[in-house]
Regions:
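Charge-dense, helix-prone N-terminal extensions
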Residues: 1-141
Length: 141
């Protein structure tokens, strides 16, 4: 039976995301450093990801100013008590056709016995922005 190395199971993008997460865990930076890291990652994104990430950032900060901005697997994220609540993943990160706005298990987005924890974004209309703000407020309630 042929064996493969574990690294062959992951794409180059996935391996880079894991390396970024390891660097983030080592840094365990303050809220100010987290914001600077997040803004730097957004600035590195190609368009249209950058514009979308900037808008999502503004929405999250306005909806839940107590969340701590940071990076998570090299992407913008927002934490409460050190635990990631929500995140933005640029389409360019894994070379897919849509960006993702998602929630982690500590987000209070429960809705009955089944609910979405991630949303595909191809653009942001006013209704989408309002929905993201509503979801973020619910997530931290």
């Amino acid at each position: 039976m042929k064996t493969t190395k574990a690294t062959e199971s992951f794409t180059a993008e996935e391996r880079e995301a894991m390396k970024e997460r390891a660097r983030e865990a080592k840094a365990a930076s303050s809220k100010a450093d987290g914001l600077n890291d997040l803004l730097a990652k957004i600035a590195e994104m190609p368009e249209p990801d950058r514009s979308m990430a900037e808008r999502v950032h503004a929405i999250v900060v306005a909806a839940a100013p107590d969340l701590a901005p940071r990076t998570w697997y090299g992407m913008p994220a927002y934490a409460k008590d050190g635990k990631t609540i929500c995140f933005f993943q640029a389409a360019s990160k894994f070379k897919v056709r849509y960006s993702t706005f998602g929630f982690q298990p500590d987000a209070m987005v429960d809705d009955g016995s089944m609910w979405p924890v991630a949303y595909a974004l191809t653009e942001l209309a006013a209704a989408d922005e309002a929905r993201i703000a509503e979801l973020v407020k619910k997530a931290v309630s």
